[in-house]
Amino acid sequence: MKFLDEAKVYIRSGDGGNGCVAFRREKFIEFGGPNGGNGGRGGDIIVEAADGLNTLIDYRYQQHFKAQKGGNGMGSDRHGAGGKDIVMKVPVGTQIFDEDKETLIHDFTKVGERFVLAKGGNGGFGNAHFKSSTNRAPRHANPGLPGEERWIWLRLKLIADAGLVGLPNAGKSTFLSKVSAAKPKIADYPFTTLHPQLGVVNSDGREFVLADIPGLIEGAHEGAGLGDRFLGHIERCRVLLHLIDATCEHAGKAYKTVRGELEAYAETLVDKIEIVALNKIDAVEPDELKKQKDRLKRAAKKTPLLLSGVTGQGVPEALRALVAVIGEAPVSDKAIGTADNPAEAKPWAPQDA
């Protein structure tokens, strides 16, 4: 299934039904009195976080959602039926932004969570409602109130146990395909991965979700390369596996480049638990491998793991290291700045498609 992590959607809740002007008409009853019913309430637009979804692709093909209007009131004190609600299903991790692309409306963090995005209009009162001691036969009724309408942005931030980060061509997709059933596109050129990929990994009977995040380059937080569009996905990963290409010019500089982009986007990203690994060790000579390992160790201030996504060497050890820390890592299910005050959320500007 094609991955889509942003969509612009138009929503409109249902209008309320009109109240009715009617009078009781019955044999031998000369003054039956008013009996016009009230209009029904319009349908709501509700967004629900559903299990089993991991993309917003459905909202590329259907972008307009209009709830049903409430039924009109009728005579004999019959009230109009309420309009049918529309429930929009989204993956866990979806955020709703206003049309200005900055105001965060809601953040879905658990399955089954619901949010009423637009309430239906109230139904109008029928003339029976206005009957009083001084007005025994009111001849007016209220129209229903209009529903709410607006454009919104949906943005998905994947929730994964671990995330793969690194420069383009660091071997992230190869690693993911080696340890899971995911089939990401793999090629010998930068930016092969254009969308995040998810895979379920099994290590010694323990399962966890691993996300392959498209490669970052220097200046990504300012829009370079694929920009910071996918940096948001890293926010919700509990642990990061940072892969560095052993065949690159300087492993230490490559490591610092990615760390600098993470810190520039949000300081909380650099506080996440990180496992550093030198990848593609099968493609370099032993002497060069030792130099790269030492450079990376000095830059990261920790001893890196050595692995090869192609041959599988060192991969089981990397998975065990991930499993060991995933259980201890905090769950980052809230977007930066949204836990207490949504107004302080970091602005996000979707790319106009």
From Swiss-Prot:
GTP binds at residues 166-173, 191-195, 212-215, 279-282, 308-310. Its cofactor is Mg(2+). GO terms for cellular component: cytoplasm. It is found in: Cytoplasm. Its EC number is 3.6.5.-. Mg(2+) binds at S173, T193. One of its GO terms (biological process) is ribosome biogenesis. Pfam families: GTP1_OBG, MMR_HSR1. GO terms for molecular function: GTP binding; GTPase activity; magnesium ion binding. Residues 160-327 form the OBG-type G domain. Keywords: Cytoplasm, GTP-binding, Hydrolase, Magnesium, Metal-binding, Nucleotide-binding. InterPro entries: G_OBG, GTP-bd, GTP-bd_Obg/CgtA, GTP1-OBG_CS, GTP1_OBG_dom, GTP1_OBG_dom_sf, OBG_GTPase, P-loop_NTPase. Residues 1-159 form the Obg domain. An essential GTPase which binds GTP, GDP and possibly (p)ppGpp with moderate affinity, with high nucleotide exchange rates and a fairly low GTP hydrolysis rate. Plays a role in control of the cell cycle, stress response, ribosome biogenesis and in those bacteria that undergo differentiation, in morphogenesis control. Belongs to the TRAFAC class OBG-HflX-like GTPase superfamily. OBG GTPase family. Monomer. NCBIfam families: Obg_CgtA, PRK12297.1, PRK12299.1. HAMAP family: GTPase_Obg. This is GTPase Obg. It comes from Rhodopseudomonas palustris (strain ATCC BAA-98 / CGA009). The lineage of its organism: Bacteria, Pseudomonadati, Pseudomonadota, Alphaproteobacteria, Hyphomicrobiales.
